[in-house]
């Protein structure tokens, strides 16, 4: 006869009512952070799970190193604060830390994530909106880690309205491939005394884009310019020599109404690194140091073939902290941080010559073609 056993598991849960603070918000632990599906593994999207948080799509559509923008209880989008291990993590425009890929990677290294939407306590400041705080993972006496890769492509995607099939764009829709991969490892450097935790995450994306734009009619590229109203000119029906090299950069129409379409693959490469060291100096002294770096490169089209921008973003955040316990009721934490953001946008010169250079102190003027 088989034995019958009964097991009772008691799992600690957060109290439904907070009797020690008037703050409103929510805590997401490491298990929930790991289990919740996130498009692009952008952990800032966890914010939108909270009541009172609204996404500002008009701020994110450009996708240019602005991170994620949201409004908390109707407050302006620049009224939110972001902290990692107790130090600021804000981009140059006032939003969350983000890259040229418009993502904030590093979810594999997050131990705890919290957002406070109202009634901030005295330890926070500088904001009238919400307060996001992130605690990174640290090593333990046991080695542990993870490996992952996520693949997304266009096999099951639907064609949107602008993906028009032409001789130039014969495919059903532009190709799209995204690979998110990486891992983490942590453990002891000296048992019970010194620990490490390292995280790497990579993003490789090839985003197909169908561009549709108005271009210059073929009749307006030949001299003399037609007088049927197709081309605008002031008396002289010739094309200025200075304009001809610029005119040659614009493609001929391949759609009705002087429109042009062409396919373009926008490549993006992002690499995220984060390392943390924890040191138990003595029973009354602990310290840690963490370095976070994210570097992204992207090539983005500007409406016509050959018109592109090479984009680079590099974010670096360093935190060093030491905590000393004087008495059971008195302790002090000394913390130092450093942050740096590098942004670089360059476009190749399609025409050359001093007549096309911008002179400092002189207006750019207006070119009519």
Regions found by a protein language model. Give the residues of each.
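Short acidic-glycine motifs
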Residues: 1-369
């Amino acid at each position: 006869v088989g034995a019958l056993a009964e097991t009772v598991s008691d799992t600690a849960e957060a109290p439904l009512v907070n009797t020690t603070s008037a703050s409103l918000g929510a805590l997401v632990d490491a298990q929930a952070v790991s289990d919740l599906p996130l498009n692009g593994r952008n952990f800032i999207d966890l914010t939108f799970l909270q009541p009172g948080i609204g996404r500002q799509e008009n701020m994110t559509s450009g996708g240019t190193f602005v991170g994620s923008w949201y409004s908390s209880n109707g407050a302006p989008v620049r009224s939110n604060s972001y902290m990692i291990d107790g130090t600021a993590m804000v981009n140059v425009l006032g939003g969350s830390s983000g890259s040229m890929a418009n993502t904030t990677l590093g979810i594999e290294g997050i131990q705890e994530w919290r957002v406070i939407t109202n009634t901030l306590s005295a330890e926070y400041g500088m904001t009238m909106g919400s307060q996001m705080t992130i605690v990174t993972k640290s090593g333990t006496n046991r080695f542990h880690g993870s490996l992952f890769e996520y693949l997304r492509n266009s096999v099951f995607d639907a064609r949107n309205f602008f993906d028009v099939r032409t001789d130039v764009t014969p495919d059903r829709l532009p190709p799209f491939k995204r690979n998110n991969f990486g891992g983490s490892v942590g453990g002891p450097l000296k048992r019970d005394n010194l620990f490490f935790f390292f995280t790497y995450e990579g993003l490789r994306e090839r985003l197909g884009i169908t561009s549709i734009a108005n271009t210059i009619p073929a009749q307006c590229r030949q001299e003399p310019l037609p007088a049927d109203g197709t081309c605008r000119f002031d008396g002289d029906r010739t094309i200025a020599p200075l304009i001809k090299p610029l005119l040659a950069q614009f493609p001929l129409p391949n759609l009705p109404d002087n429109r042009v379409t062409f396919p373009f693959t926008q490549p993006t490469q992002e690499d995220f690194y984060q390392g943390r060291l924890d040191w138990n100096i003595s029973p009354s002294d602990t310290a840690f140091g963490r370095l976070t770096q994210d570097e992204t490169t992207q090539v983005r089209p500007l409406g016509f073939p050959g018109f592109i921008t090479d984009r680079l973003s590099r974010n670096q955040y360093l935190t060093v902290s030491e905590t000393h316990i004087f008495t059971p009721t008195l302790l002090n934490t000394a913390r130092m941080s450093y942050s740096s953001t590098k942004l670089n946008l360059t476009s190749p010169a399609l025409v050359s010559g001093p007549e096309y250079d911008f002179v400092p102190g002189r207006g750019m003027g207006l070119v009519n073609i």
